[in-house]
Amino acid sequence: MGSNSSFSARRTALAMAVALCCAWQSPVYAHGSEAHMVPMDKTLQAFGADVQWDDYAQMFTIVKDGAFVKVKPGANTAIVNGKPLTLQVPVVMKNNKAYIPETFINDVFQSGLDQTFQVEKRPHPLNALTADEINQAVAIVKASADFKPNTRFTQIALAEPEKAKVWDFVLNGTAVDAPRQANIIMLDGKHIIESRVDLKDKKILRWEPIKDAHGMVLLDDFNTVQQIINESPEFAAVLKKRGITDPKKVITTPLTVGFFDGKDGLKQEDRLLKVISYLDVGDGNYWAHPIENLVAVVDLEQKKIQKIEEGPVVPVPLTPRPYDGRDRVETVKKPLEIIEPEGKNYTITGDMVHWQNWDFHLSLDSRVGPMISTVTYNDNGKKRQMMYQGSLGGMIVPYGDPDIGWYFKAYLDSGDYGMGTLTSPLVRGKDVPSNAVMLNETIPDYTGAPMEIPRAIAIFERYAGPEYKHQELGKPNVSTERRELVVRWVSTVGNYDYIFDWVFHENGTIGIDAGATGIEAVKGVDRKSVV
């Protein structure tokens, strides 16, 4: 199974006994004919479900979006969201491996017990581009005589209709008659081109080169930089001064150079990246081993190092600092399950989310991440327009250290790197609670091809404490609970993992919780010179 869907490696003697008792000794039948059995792990992994073996209860727990399933090997009944469901064929074991009938997914997950997802009858005008529309938009611009073969794509997104028409659709159901269009930003070497295409008529509406601007740092730039560093004899020479003889153990991080009006000796018209490096010592955490006071300026067009900036040699810290837990004893924890036995209190219709009095549209942008749009709140029968569109506007991380390897560090994480592109798939039960619904999202990559990000966004309802309580002497207690709906997204930019929560409250307010986890940026220093 995948990283978030795995069977426990530990099997108790009782578990083995159950497996042997339920062993597949003879054909299994459904509706009078032999059932076609398939491996549980591969089948449910492909379906996107999370599977765990519960040693204590001697059963499998299966979680997929709004459904929480418990099933024992050999049992004719499964428990789906707290309700019994008769199985046509039980789960069977053969050679310690679980098998399910090919009808299992349809029987269990299409049983009508989960109504979280609804069919969208009228597409919302702000629905993100589909994979087919992304392919279509790219094909249109590639057919242009102005398109060059090595051009890359920094953004392909919906060209949004007029705001007034979108609101009219949301509030009154009036169809938006404007054709679907796409905005495209391309990078031809160091030259930026902005374009707009009509997806219905398959024609280009705009093609405009943008002057005095730099493009985003793309994922293939990381590979280009690493290759340049590995093959550079000049860089290998400066590594030797620091006792490093194998350049392939050096991990590079390409950073934007900033603007210093020529005082750093760099030309703003060149497409440059400053590269700082770390040493891979085998502990899985190269961030703990910075190669300090060494910066390579790489020209992406020329594909070579333009110059190397050096300061005093600082010894590379070599003490292993793993972060994956290999040096710690894991705390044994009993399972903590959050179930909704009667189903979700929210529904997802296409890209629209409805919870209590809230309705909003949700999509993922390759630059800013989640976009919450056309937010309304039903205030005693009146649908109030709360927010047209909300998203991360931008983010800057200035370090403020004057040293040679730090003074230029002021990352524009969203604008320079694309935080939506760097979305980190969420792990159920760790990054989000077990009752979360996971949403896959599709955005374009730098080649213009659709790229699906699994488990990109999570939605879940949670208990948020008591809303009100009063215990009058001699009278019954009066208490009410508070509920919240959370939309969670995580973006990993280098060593930092940024967590963003949009929190919808029952009282008509919206909160935004933002935080960072991951690994702190560290600086190597000579301890002899540190007080």
PLM ranges: what are they?
Residues K72-A78, Q88-K94, D198-K203, I229, ...:
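A short, sequence-level motif marking secondary-structure junctions
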Residues G2-R122:
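Primary recognition of N-terminal secretory signal peptides and signal-anchoring hydrophobic helices
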Residues M59-I62, A75-N81, I184, V353, ...:
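Short polybasic amphipathic segments
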Residues K163, G215-V531:
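Beta-strand/loop-rich accessory regions of lumenal/periplasmic or secreted enzymes
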Residues V63-G66, E120-T245:
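Post-signal-peptide, soluble extracytosolic/periplasmic N-terminal scaffold domains
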Residues D41-Q45, T103, D107, N135, ...:
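Solvent-exposed, polar/charged alpha-helical surfaces in well-ordered, non-transmembrane soluble domains
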Residues D50-Y56, V69-T77, G112-V119, K148-P149, ...:
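Extended intrinsically disordered, low-complexity coil regions enriched in Ser, Thr, Gly, Ala
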Residues S33-V38, M93-Y99, G173-P179, D188, ...:
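Short, low-complexity cationic-aromatic patches
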